[in-house]
């Protein structure tokens, strides 16, 4: 059909045409729908059975003769590879059927296209199949759908599965020959198939009597694979498979073309892959190998090309892996992920698949009836539960895996990824304008071609920025930019990647300056890529300002060290002090320089002095002056060489903890030596200073911050206070309030009176901490808690707002810190204002009473509380020349027990009793286990259970108050019985450990010192306190003598005036004074005596004092002063006043004579007696307040309300469970002791007999001298100790923590003898006895030299002879509470009763632990007796009064931790009190330590903190903290 040119053509017309043309060629239905035999189907669609028959090119592991096994690109036909592999796997399978099989021979002849595989395993049965009527070899090799693997009930670990393998090889071969021999059937079978199994040859059967074997020989039909011959690539693959079989089939020797393959097993096979492979550092890869069990063998090494695996299932090469590989890899990955996360805290998040990418795993497995995703068997799909075996890798394998380089490789990858992320924060392009940075005042030329001339000023806060902006009015804004810092920047050297990424401050600085990570700024051209050519640091001139400078230097040095060589950093300094007179003004940039000027300027008092605490003190006018004189105020940092790099690393690197300790030690020793020699303090920023090396900055300025950190964090041995606490006490003493005052108001007063320069919130928290008296806080609170100051419910964190609570001095405070001692103290000055003393000198060591805790830089302090009366009794023993008794920690009102495990290691036990078979009662928790915390973290999980642990208890009820604890807990009988077997204290976490291996304190000369025992602290305090009682007596004798002389003169003057011997009316003053001198009157004796105490008038009195005393001073300078006589009122002439004056004179003389008769020891004993008497009164009042409203008390607390109150008391029917100190606990404690001794010996410190090296100076000179009998008190180490974990070397909470084992004992300082003739000088005020001035500068060293002490007595180690009474039962004993007391407490021999007044003895508790109920007063062993006697004396050897006296003198047993005093028991009180039976197992045992504070080795020869040099500003404090006072 023709188409018209105009006729449209459509698709239907074309189709019709085609149909007509093909009509004759239409296929029949039969030809379209065909049925093929299976043989025809296999040949027609081979990819279904053997994979592709087309050539493919891909990366494969092959074996080449010249290079061995290697991974390269090969071109091969997968189908051909598969048919070869089927026959090879069949040969290997025969090993599973016949363990005796030992050899496989593979022959590959590429030229003749012949492949042969022979094995000597058990032959195929040469017997006719009775069903199929054909011989078995012909059946399984020549007929499809035949196999021995069809019985799924039989668990096989062979590669054959579907019955196709060998037949497929036959089908795709032009010739296929089977030859097998069976010794069992005594026949040999041989048959050949040709033409793709289309034609079978004749079967040959021969008799046979040799060893079994099977041999398959075939010639692949290359035409089916579109190949001409067996090329190099396919042969290389086949050879590698021969090696695979050699490695994966145990105890089978494989020959290839007649040659034995050099593979001795799977481990040997793995080495073929790793030949010449090295890691990132050039070392050979480390292989971890484990034969887990007969079915699993695993090797692991590091991979640099992503996850790699070489695996075999029943000799099949699973090139794509499968579930068997995942099963093994997941075990390894889970362990490695944990390790990587620990080592990469805060870094880039690492996921499991990223860890897996660094692993190369080799697995050889035998799996029962494996399944695959295809006939090619490259991926094993069987689920792990069906493997028929398990592969649990050993801890040894995992540990080796962690150390084989994989973890390091992952961490390097993490760093690389982190660097990529950091680089995204940087801009490689220099911008003239940048956006998105608040508070930045950019220089106009920043980012331009003049950018190298621009300077970025980094200021400490917004106020400093304002000062800088004011100064820019002088130098202009084109070249100077300003950016304020929000405090201290991050220590990037130890910060995590996450911290750096999220730190806005650091990212802003990088963006402003135009810095790029990993860029080297070596040459000038690289500097031109920056937006600023310099950074100027402008901070306050205090220690915290120095720290900020150091952190910025560290930031640049860590990331771009080359910038430091270009003088990239500089600082802007401002004055600390300015003095002015008339129009003359002098600025000083360090306090030592100011002191030098004062000493060289005779009339310096006429100059006006102004102190600058920070940049905010300067005015805008002064800012302009500073910037106008840029040469004086700009100090460049100069790089002087590798010593600068070392110094910066020393200050900020976590790895140099020990070096930093030695650095601080040397600094303190050097400062002390300079002070002793009278040398001036070393300082920076003199008048000619224009540059500063980094080394000088670190060693002369930054070190002051580190030292001040310790001063603010570690208390003084003398008064147990930190500076902030001392400021509070100083203010309270000065105010002497008779009425309560709000905490918030007191904090303001403290800031004003003691020159406190920081936020008042931390002061308020300090005040609250000083007033707290709940269990676990203070044993003696110096302030009264009037209001809610916190309770044991929340550990004090439940205190009310400081605006709502009141406080005032405790009645005991001034008895502990007698005003008479104030005149002997050395008061400090701040901003020309006299503030708190260097330390107070209490009558007992308060650091033992209230304990101490703090973390500084390099060292930490932890000391528990001790019982007040035990400490007092030990002081009395020392005063009497006796040895003090060992003391156990003790906490006021704690009803549990504390036992010693080992030296300085204790276990603290709560109280638990059994009420019935399903109920227990917890009536006390370990110290500092707060009630609410215990409920939430212990009882709630026990009640509700967790995913891993089922619930243990069925219910609990709470009956506690703010001061007592009572949980009543319900359990099933079975679980209670099991808990009893394990130990109720252990199950319910009612035991905690306490370790005191870090008793580090500042001694009286301001040196850090480590004490080995609490008795060492007590002895040091005793020597110092006794000396100061001598000084007090000397001062009182002088003062009383002067006052007596004054009264005597006044009385004589009045009498002579009355008698008319002296006429003063209408006489000139000079003549009158002359008359008084002639008649023998003394110039004001009191004033003269005070002036005599000062060789030089106090140069540091504040201006108010100067003003007030100017008149009297001028009068004094003119000659004698008789104002004390001439200023007396006229009414002193009356008879009454005259008689009173004479009486006062006589009384004063009597007082003086009485004082002369007393020794310093007598004065001390008097103070102790008065203190104890008042303590009894205070405690009685506290007890009375606690008992208000309790049952059985008088008043309204009866009936229903009384019954409710009874619920809070422990149940009288409970059977107390005695806490057990297990063998494991003691063993652990002893282990720690041995480790400590071992580490000490390793460090070179002798451990025998307490003999130790000499002083610090001797150690420096390497003279290891022994000092027999010296007290063992360790000092700052010069040898490194083991390092501890620390995130930030400058952080209070994490500073330089070392492990317990690294304590190093260093000897005590050699004491310097004081001259006996040196007369003590006292701090006095010329106008009143109530205000005190500082000591004379020249006498300062003399007064605070080491004490002139007699040779120390041989140290008696505390003996652990306080035996626990034996109890029945294994790990937990339950005893009747009544009989516990009656039967278990022996009497102890009496001792003299001289320490306490007899009338107070009756009310003392006879046992240290408030245990369970007692019905009668029994004589009980004291802690002192238990500590020194091996056996108690027989009962009844002493009378009650003697026993009472004995108990008063000696410490009570370890169990009664500061229990409330009990009067002799009566029926009323015993019914209502908590059951008081004493724990049989709770006297002294040796204890296991709690988490480690820094082991610290401190030198007692360290110089005290000099209070001159740069003005100190303490670090910023946390607003809410239990240990807020730790931060001062």
Swiss-Prot record:
Residues found modified as N-acetylmethionine: 1
Cofactor note: Binds two Mg(2+) per subunit. The magnesium ions form salt bridges with both the protein and the DNA. Can also accept other divalent metal cations, such as Mn(2+) or Ca(2+).
Annotated binding of ATP, by residue: 90, 119, 147-149, 160-167, 375-377
EC number: 5.6.2.2
Modified residues (Phosphoserine): 4, 1105, 1211, 1291, 1293, 1295, 1298, 1328, 1333, 1370, 1373, 1384, 1388, 1465, 1467, 1470, 1472, 1521
Marked site (Transition state stabilizer) residue numbers: 803
Localisation per UniProt entry: Cytoplasm; Nucleus, Nucleoplasm; Nucleus; Nucleus, Nucleolus
Catalytic residues as annotated in Swiss-Prot or TrEMBL: 804
Annotated positions of the N6-acetyllysine modification: 1418, 1438
Reaction(s) catalysed by this chain's protein: ATP-dependent breakage, passage and rejoining of double-stranded DNA
GO MF annotations in UniProt: ATP binding; chromatin binding; DNA binding, bending; DNA topoisomerase type II (double strand cut, ATP-hydrolyzing) activity; magnesium ion binding; protein heterodimerization activity; protein homodimerization activity; protein kinase C binding
Region (Disordered): 1090-1118, 1183-1211, 1229-1528
Site residues by UniProt (Interaction with DNA): 488, 491, 660-661, 722, 756, 762, 930
Record cross-link Glycyl lysine isopeptide (Lys-Gly) (interchain with G-Cter in SUMO1), residues: 1238
Glycyl lysine isopeptide (Lys-Gly) (interchain with G-Cter in SUMO2) cross-link site: 17, 155-156, 351, 385, 396, 415, 417, 424, 439, 465, 479, 528, 583, 598, 613, 621, 624, 631, 638, 654, 661, 675, 1074, 1193, 1201, 1226, 1238, 1272, 1279, 1282, 1359, 1363, 1382, 1418, 1438, 1450, 1455, 1480, 1488
Entry PTM: Phosphorylation has no effect on catalytic activity. However, phosphorylation at Ser-1105 by CSNK1D/CK1 promotes DNA cleavable complex formation.
InterPro entries (UniProt xref): DNA_Topoisomerase_II (IPR050634), DTHCT (IPR012542), HATPase_C_sf (IPR036890), Ribosomal_Su5_D2-typ_SF (IPR020568), Ribsml_uS5_D2-typ_fold_subgr (IPR014721), Topo_IIA (IPR001241), Topo_IIA-like_dom_sf (IPR013760), Topo_IIA_A/C_ab (IPR013758)
Biased composition (Low complexity): 1108-1118, 1296-1306
CDD domains (UniProt xref): HATPase_TopII-like, TOP4c, TopoIIA_Trans_ScTopoIIA, TOPRIM_TopoIIA
Bias type Acidic residues, positions: 1098-1107, 1326-1345
Enzyme class, UniProt record, top EC level: isomerase
Annotated spans, Interaction with PLSCR1: 1429-1435
Source species, domain of life: Eukaryota
Protein name: DNA topoisomerase 2-alpha
Originating organism: Mus musculus
Gene (UniProt): Top2a
